[in-house]
From Swiss-Prot:
Disulfide bonds join 155-171, 160-167, 299-413, 487-499, 488-501, 492-498. Belongs to the sulfatase family. This is Arylsulfatase A. The modification 3-oxoalanine (Cys) is found at residue 68. It catalyses: an N-acyl-1-beta-D-(3-O-sulfo)-galactosyl-sphing-4-enine + H2O = a beta-D-galactosyl-(1<->1')-N-acylsphing-4-enine + sulfate + H(+). Its cofactor is Ca(2+). Homodimer at neutral pH and homooctamer at acidic pH. Exists both as a single chain of 58 kDa (component A) or as a chain of 50 kDa (component B) linked by disulfide bond(s) to a 7 kDa chain (component C). Interacts with SUMF1. One of its GO terms (cellular component) is endoplasmic reticulum.
């Protein structure tokens, strides 16, 4: 048997004999430069750093859109959010739309393979009438979490750090307090934020233990609210990080990762559990020291520059994945087809934008991904993709700043930088210039034939991609209905402030 055939046979046997448990940890508004393993000098992230040391650390891992709702849709479906209608912007508490039920999620793929599926944390893919778009209707057997960002409701009277440090800012006004849901039932409204991460960890432990008792593999999607603004943490992490509220929030996220890994170890499942860590988009730089760090990369959340779309990513599976660092291209879109391959689950009968990178993970080959296409948070079919990376080169056909990346020293990041077309496109060699500082088409040494050929190829890729892409009907354009806001006391008055059932401080 040829060596390549042997590797394929081993991978096939792995996917059918004993599919691994899957722990997918998704951080919120975390920058490329925020973790210790990615070079931050003062972050306290020992558990994540341990995953990086014992697993595969990606240097070139991307999300297709640098905003919460579309990025989460891409992660769970393996499809660009313009296909599923998850644009423009984000869904809110009153949104009538959501992730269409005909979209096939990673949870549905794995549930059909026999997995016990659960989600803890931030959903942000719609609520809908009677909770029609919530996780229990999208393939998750169990759900404990908040259906959108925790700043999408008034927070001026909430405690973010114990014993009584209030949340910074006022968050969104005129809405119901944020609800914590257990499946489709309101558990607390609003929940005690300093105790929220601990509740998620407890929920996750129970799910993993129950799956083992049932003799089933588990899929846990742990979508932490950390490090989204306003930051919060429990007593064990408050004022402990040395990096202020953001650092405390990040430290609690790291602590949760440690607690989850301890549970996996206590259950004797370390070599049977594939752990993936990444984040939805780059840092919200407008928050300054409370907004995270994109490291060497340009701009952050809301932009198609590297700081908005390149994310830390770690994959850990002892005995199966050799520790190291990879510079291969990969995307959050790739997780669904990759996990389907590793578990022996059939792919959904839809157009997927992700590719199977299991050969890269298992050390039997390279990533088949050669290009990454980036849409802005507010896309349209006229402009199509704003930027394309192919190999080491990235071209920006359009750029646009974002309020999320205000306050930086780079005006290209700011909301005041309106939509700008570039002809010829801006072209960067990311192998030498990951910060996108030097347009190679303006090099004082002249433009190399290689760069010109790369530009020509990327221009062709964009033209072909835009021509082939069909935007799905926008779910966000369906508008809002305040009656859809979740309320623990639906007929109470005065609405929405009467929707107040805080529960216990635990």
């Amino acid at each position: 048997m040829a060596l390549g055939t042997l590797f394929l046979a081993l991978a096939a046997g792995l996917s059918t004999a004993s599919p691994p448990n899957i722990l997918l940890i998704f951080a919120d508004d975390l920058g490329y430069g925020d973790l210790g393993s990615y070079g931050h000098p003062s972050s306290t992230t020992p558990n994540l750093d341990q995953l990086a040391e014992g697993g595969l650390r990606f240097t070139d891992f991307y999300v297709p859109v640098s905003l919460c709702t579309p990025s989460r849709a891409a992660l769970l479906t393996g499809r660009l959010p313009v296909r599923s209608g998850m644009y423009p912007g984000v869904l809110g508490p009153s949104s009538q739309g959501g992730l269409p039920l005909e979209e096939v999620t990673l949870a549905e793929v794995l549930a059909a393979r026999g997995y016990l599926t659960g989600m803890a944390g931030k959903w942000h893919l719609g609520v809908g009438p009677e909770g029609a778009f919530l996780p229990p209707h999208q393939g998750f057997h169990r759900f404990l979490g908040i259906p959108y960002s925790h700043d999408q409701g008034p927070c001026q009277n909430l405690t973010c750090f114990p014993p009584d440090i209030p949340c910074k800012g006022g968050c969104d006004q005129g809405l119901v307090p944020i609800p914590l849901l257990a499946n489709l039932t309101v558990e607390a409204q609003p929940p005690w934020l300093p105790g929220l991460e601990a509740r998620y960890v407890s929920f996750s432990r129970d799910l993993m233990a129950d799956a083992q008792r049932q003799g089933r593999p588990f899929f846990l999607y742990y979508a932490s609210h950390h490090t989204h603004y306003p930051q919060f943490s429990g007593q064990s992490f408050t004022k402990r990080s040395g990096r202020g509220p953001f650092g405390d929030s990040l430290m609690e996220l790291d602590g949760a990762v440690g607690a989850l890994m301890t549970t996996v170890g206590d259950l004797g499942l370390l070599e049977e559990t594939l752990v993936i860590f990444t984040a939805d988009n780059g840092p919200e730089l407008m928050r300054m020291s409370n907004g995270g760090c994109s490291g060497l990369l340009r701009c952050g959340k809301g932009t198609t520059f590297e700081g908005g779309v390149r994310e830390p990513a770690l994959v850990y599976w002892p005995g199966h994945i050799t520790p190291g660092v990879t510079h291969e291209l990969a995307s959050s879109l790739d997780l669904l087809p990759t996990l389907a391959a590793l578990t022996g689950a059939p792919l959904p009968n839809v157009t997927l934008d992700g590719v199977d990178i299991s050969p890269l993970l298992l050390g039997t080959g390279k990533s088949p991904r050669k290009s990454v296409f980036f849409y802005p948070p507010y896309p349209d079919e006229i402009h199509g993709v704003f930027a394309v990376r192919n190999g080491k080169y990235k071209a920006h056909f359009f750029t646009q700043g974002s309020a999320h990346s205000d306050t930086t020293s780079d005006p290209a990041c700011h909301a005041a930088n309106r939509l700008t077309a570039h002809e010829p496109p801006l072209l960067y060699d990311l192998s030498q210039d990951p910060g996108e500082n030097y347009n190679v088409l303006e090099s004082i040494e002249g433009v190399s034939p290689e760069a010109l050929q790369a530009l020509k190829h990327i221009q062709l890729l964009k033209a072909q991609y835009d021509a082939a892409m069909t935007f799905g009907p926008s779910q966000i354009a369906k508008g809002e209905d305040p009656a859809l806001q979740i309320c623990c006391q639906p007929s109470c008055t005065p609405h929405p402030v009467c929707c107040h059932c805080p529960g216990s401080q635990s």
